[in-house]
């Protein structure tokens, strides 16, 4: 079973769309999903809740299942604002374009650290400098904490 967590309806037809993470238990049991995609949804939670949100999501992954996270990177946004002449309107467009309400900002290191704390193996991490989006792929192994 493949899941996509997103505020906007995805074009992926082979994934089950969950638009409200609090309802994920209705769609998938623990250790059932082979792949979970989180598309610009983590910032809709307060920063202090990031660990618990990721923990609940990761609990839905099978052993060897993977999670892919797309999230705007605040470090890259600040860099563009400072060095590239990005304006305040540009930042507002980036942060509030499709994410709905925003309760926190994140960078790639924060997300990677939380995933590692949950016992996941990071397979890939990079920042798309054009979209200023962190892209992280991690896998749940069978030797978790």
Model feature map: region roles:
Residues 1-28, 68-145:
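Class I (Rossmann-like) S-adenosyl-L-methionine-dependent methyltransferase catalytic domain
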Residues 5-7, 39-40, 61:
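Short His-Asn-centered micro-motif
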Residues 24-38:
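A short acidic, Gly/Pro-enriched loop at the edge of an enzyme's catalytic core
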Residues 33-35, 60, 71, 114:
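Functionally constrained cores in energy, signaling, and assembly domains
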Residues 34-41, 50-53:
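A short beta-strand submotif of the Rossmann-like class I SAM-dependent methyltransferase core
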Residues 46-47:
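Helix-capping/helix-break motifs at membrane-protein junctions
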Residues 51-66:
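A short glycine-rich, Lys/Arg-flanked "PGG" loop and its adjoining helix->strand segment in the class I
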């Amino acid at each position: 079973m493949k899941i996509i967590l997103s505020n906007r309806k995805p074009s992926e037809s082979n994934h089950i769309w969950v638009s409200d993470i609090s309802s994920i238990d209705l769609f998938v049991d623990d250790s059932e999903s082979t792949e979970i995609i989180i598309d610009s949804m983590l910032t809709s939670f307060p920063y202090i809740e990031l660990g618990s949100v990721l923990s609940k999501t990761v609990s839905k992954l099978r052993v060897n299942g993977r999670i892919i996270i797309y999230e705007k990177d605040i470090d890259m946004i600040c860099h563009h604002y400072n060095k590239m002449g990005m304006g305040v309107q540009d930042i507002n467009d980036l942060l509030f374009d499709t994410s709905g309400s925003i309760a926190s900002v994140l960078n790639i290191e924060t997300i990677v650290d939380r995933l590692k704390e949950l016992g996941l193996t990071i397979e890939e991490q990079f920042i798309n400098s054009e979209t200023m989006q962190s892209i992280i792929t991690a896998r749940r192994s069978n030797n978790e904490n």
